[in-house]
Amino acid sequence: MQDKFIKKRHILEYEDKQLINVKLGITTREDGLSPYPHNAFNMARYIDDSQQNITKHQEMLATVIGFPREQWVFPIQTHENKVVKVTSNDKGTNIDALNDALHGVDALYTYEPNLLLTMCYADCVPIYFYSEKNHFIGLAHAGWRGTVGQIVNALISNIDFDLNDLNVVIGPATSTSYEINDDIKSKFETLPIDINQYIDTRGTDRHGIDLKRANALLLENAGVPKDNIYITNYATSEDLSLFFSYRVEKGNTGRMLAFIGQ
């Protein structure tokens, strides 16, 4: 079955017949102006890159997806589980330059139109939430810390409609080649889901983990119907021609931008 993330210029766009007024996807590393190592489509202002490159990439993306930069919102992510509701007053936050607005925020949601929620990724899991019926969109950033902190639950706790009307898309992230040690594994053991469904022990102090699967299980446990959750097969750590991977490239890499707008 074909993946619902469809490759287009600069992006992978999620396509589904249920989507009418919502657009969501993630940028790729292709056809840009940045190093990492060359011609990369980096979207992060907080790494070693020309600010002019980022602005140009934003302008290119705005043209592709039909959301002007003035409608974008970008938080300063810190691998925590803080969730913030955004409104039209937040338009343009951290787009032209970074400031302290929305600092320490790893999930956003809104019920308002003409907003594009955005965050940067390079292995962590982008998790998109939407309900066309309720004019709701959300976006979460879940690395291992955010997963342990149950950021998906933190976002869902703000929803005031029936979860049967919520759809969740789990986007490109690191593959099951990602490994954690005993100490980190012990943190996952505190979660209310079956650890054997997403962690496998591979040796002394070595455990493979499927972060996409872990977040899907947390969503199900929180009451989101399994049929309403989609998990892409794309893996950032397995295709460096398409994605940046912080772990594989040992931190010397760019960032993709996940986005969802209505």
UniProtKB/Swiss-Prot annotation:
Cofactor(s) demanded: Cu(2+); Zn(2+)
GO molecular-function terms, A-Z: adenosine deaminase activity; copper ion binding; oxidoreductase activity; S-methyl-5-thioadenosine phosphorylase activity
Keyword annotations: Copper, Hydrolase, Metal-binding, Oxidoreductase, Transferase, Zinc
Top-level division of the source organism's lineage: Bacteria
Residue numbers binding Zn(2+): 79, 124, 141
Entry protein name: Purine nucleoside phosphorylase SSP1584
Family the UniProt entry places it in: Belongs to the purine nucleoside phosphorylase YfiH/LACC1 family.
Its EC number(s): 2.4.2.1, 3.5.4.4, 2.4.2.28
Function: Purine nucleoside enzyme that catalyzes the phosphorolysis of adenosine and inosine nucleosides, yielding D-ribose 1-phosphate and the respective free bases, adenine and hypoxanthine. Also catalyzes the phosphorolysis of S-methyl-5'-thioadenosine into adenine and S-methyl-5-thio-alpha-D-ribose 1-phosphate. Also has adenosine deaminase activity.
Alphabetized NCBIfam families for the sequence: peptidoglycan editing factor PgeF (TIGR00726)
UniProt KW Nucleotide-binding keyword: no
Catalytic activity: adenosine + phosphate = alpha-D-ribose 1-phosphate + adenine; S-methyl-5'-thioadenosine + phosphate = 5-(methylsulfanyl)-alpha-D-ribose 1-phosphate + adenine; inosine + phosphate = alpha-D-ribose 1-phosphate + hypoxanthine; adenosine + H2O + H(+) = inosine + NH4(+)
Organism: Staphylococcus saprophyticus subsp. saprophyticus (strain ATCC 15305 / DSM 20229 / NCIMB 8711 / NCTC 7292 / S-41)
InterPro entries, A to Z: Cu_polyphenol_OxRdtase, Cu_polyphenol_OxRdtase_sf, Cytotoxic_necrot_fac-like_cat
Coiled coil location: none
Oligomeric form and interacting partners: Homodimer.
